[in-house]
């Protein structure tokens, strides 16, 4: 009975509060969803949110309002880590691009630069056929 296993206190580690004053907001806006990731200048993720993760399902994920809520949620978490200024890089053709940028400004983050990093093919893959509704 002497070599019984020692009971250890293994509690999940609490996320440390980083002091980062500037960062980059990556907004990926597709036709189906909007994903907002806020990183430090080196690209390490600090917070993220998406329309689907906030409870929007189906076609509601692709609305500007869902993108606004996702950007707000990610920005509030980033501001808890001390973020004040932000550069925005937007990718994709979705409806939530402008709404996400506006809500980042409305929450209180100062937007220094907005750049569009949507990939444009040099005539690569064949695009999907036109929809007939």
Curated annotation (Swiss-Prot):
Gene3D superfamilies assigned to the protein according to its UniProt record, in alphabetical order: Ribosomal protein S11
Record-level GO cellular component terms: ribonucleoprotein complex; ribosome
Classification via InterPro entries: Ribosomal_uS11, Ribosomal_uS11_bac-type, Ribosomal_uS11_CS, Ribosomal_uS11_sf
Keyword Lipid metabolism: no
UniProt entry keywords in alphabetical sequence: Ribonucleoprotein, Ribosomal protein, RNA-binding, rRNA-binding
GO biological process: one example: translation
Pfam families: Ribosomal_S11
Keyword Ribonucleoprotein among UniProt keywords: yes
UniProt-listed PROSITE patterns: RIBOSOMAL_S11 (PS00054)
Molecular-function GO term, any one: structural constituent of ribosome
Subunit structure: Part of the 30S ribosomal subunit. Interacts with proteins S7 and S18. Binds to IF-3.
Family classification: Belongs to the universal ribosomal protein uS11 family.
Role this protein plays: Located on the platform of the 30S subunit, it bridges several disparate RNA helices of the 16S rRNA. Forms part of the Shine-Dalgarno cleft in the 70S ribosome.
PANTHER family named in the record: 40S RIBOSOMAL PROTEIN S14/30S RIBOSOMAL PROTEIN S11
NCBIfam families in the record: PRK05309.1, uS11_bact
Protein name: Small ribosomal subunit protein uS11
Organism this protein belongs to: Shouchella clausii (strain KSM-K16)
Gene name linked to the record: rpsK
């Amino acid at each position: 009975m002497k070599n019984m296993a020692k009971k250890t206190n293994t509690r999940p580690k609490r996320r440390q509060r980083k002091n980062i004053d500037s960062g980059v907001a990556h907004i990926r806006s597709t036709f189906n969803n909007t994903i907002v990731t806020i990183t430090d200048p080196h690209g390490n993720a600090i917070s993220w949110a998406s329309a689907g993760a906030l409870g929007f399902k189906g076609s509601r994920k692709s609305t500007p309002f869902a993108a606004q809520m996702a950007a707000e949620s990610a920005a509030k978490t980033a501001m808890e880590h001390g973020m004040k200024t932000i550069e925005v890089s937007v990718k994709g053709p979705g409806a939530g691009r402008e709404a996400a940028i506006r809500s980042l400004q409305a929450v209180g983050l100062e937007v220094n630069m907005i750049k569009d990093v949507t990939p444009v093919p040099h005539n690569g893959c064949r695009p999907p056929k036109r929809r007939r509704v």
